[in-house]
Amino acid sequence: MSAPQLNKIAANSPSRQNPSELETAVAGALYDLESNTADLKAALRPLQFVSAREIEVGHGKKAIVIFVPVPSLQGFHRVQQRLTRELEKKFSDRHVLIVASRRILPRPKRSSRSRNTLKQKRPRSRTLTAVHDAILTDLVYPVEIVGKRLRVKEDGSKTLKVILDEKERGSVDYRLDTYSAVYRRLTGKNVLFEFPLVSAEY
């Protein structure tokens, strides 16, 4: 991998020292778009990613999840629709998803000693619930989540139903299975994405 391509991987990422074949391909694709696509050049130049994973989404299909530093997420969002379109041309038959790389901090122990030695309170953004909610938002961006329902079956299993903005149905309908499979793989939780039921007009 050339030095300019390697620079697309964040300096503090373990992948920078030993990138996988997929990460090498993603770095090359980002650098190629930055070099050869005039309207993406300025936006992509400062952006780097942390790692990339390929995830099976069923029916023999795969998705590529690109993990990016949290401070860079806004920069990716500004060009995300165009960027994912261009990347999906390069990685044919695979959906490309961009998710911020977040750390979950463990819940503090209840012992008095740990309470006394705890220097700083755990930020809410580092809790398991907050990180899983943020992953949901990242996966479906720029589509807005308009509602959530937790369905508990008789056997105790839980499925989260996520309602997406009806206005975006045409642009993401074909990606819903990918969103569900990737979320399950990243969090271990079942999720079902759907759109509001529109009552028929009489």
From Swiss-Prot:
UniProt keyword terms in alphabetical order: Cytoplasm, Ribonucleoprotein, Ribosomal protein
UniProt-recorded name of the protein: Small ribosomal subunit protein eS7
Annotated compartments: Cytoplasm
GO cellular component, one term: cytosolic small ribosomal subunit
Pfam families associated with the record: Ribosomal_S7e (PF01251)
Quaternary assembly: Component of the small ribosomal subunit (SSU). Mature N.crassa ribosomes consist of a small (40S) and a large (60S) subunit. The 40S small subunit contains 1 molecule of ribosomal RNA (18S rRNA) and at least 32 different proteins. The large 60S subunit contains 3 rRNA molecules (26S, 5.8S and 5S rRNA) and at least 42 different proteins.
Gene Ontology BP, a term: ribosomal small subunit biogenesis
Function according to Swiss-Prot or TrEMBL: Component of the ribosome, a large ribonucleoprotein complex responsible for the synthesis of proteins in the cell. The small ribosomal subunit (SSU) binds messenger RNAs (mRNAs) and translates the encoded message by selecting cognate aminoacyl-transfer RNA (tRNA) molecules. The large subunit (LSU) contains the ribosomal catalytic site termed the peptidyl transferase center (PTC), which catalyzes the formation of peptide bonds, thereby polymerizing the amino acids delivered by tRNAs into a polypeptide chain.
Region (Disordered): 1-20
InterPro entries per the UniProt record, alphabetical: Ribosomal_eS7, Ribosomal_eS7_CS
GO molecular function: structural constituent of ribosome
Residue ranges, compositional bias (Polar residues): 10-20
Similarity field: Belongs to the eukaryotic ribosomal protein eS7 family.
